Amino acid sequence: MAKIKLERANERTPLVKTIYTADPSAHVFDGKIYIYPSHDFEHDCPDDDNGDQYIMQDYHVLSMDSLDSECVDNGLALSQDDIPWVKNQLWAPDCICRNGKYYLVFPAKDYEGQFHIGVAVSDSPVGPFTPQENCIEGSYSIDPAVLVDDDDRVYCYYGGLWGG
């Protein structure tokens, strides 16, 4: 597993100034840092308990050659318009590499307003990602974190929210 040394000299804020991001997961694939954040759009929606104040319609993947290098927005990686079961709210994703493919695991709301977990696949860590036609059955959840264990088994940990 690749290691990156964290020092005070590496502190930087913000990573990008062109888009609003939140809730990232970060991974090192082939010696490069990839960051998978939520992408929120600016809007005038009021805050409410349904999360309607979040207009999260797509994912961008950020990348860095090192902690001291410029952070690059690699553009659109996946849009809600390309995911058949999704109505809105693409929240905090995660990504793993397995057998030469990259799997973006993400929560989103369906057309009934329920959160589910979905999966999209790419040959590249920056996408574009092709979504599976359906969400993971029984996954009424948010904030997936995916782990490939030492025995090569894959685990998905997640949180519940609003019926999850």
Locations of regions flagged by a protein language model:
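Carbohydrate-active catalytic/glycan-binding domains of CAZyme proteins
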Residues: 1-164
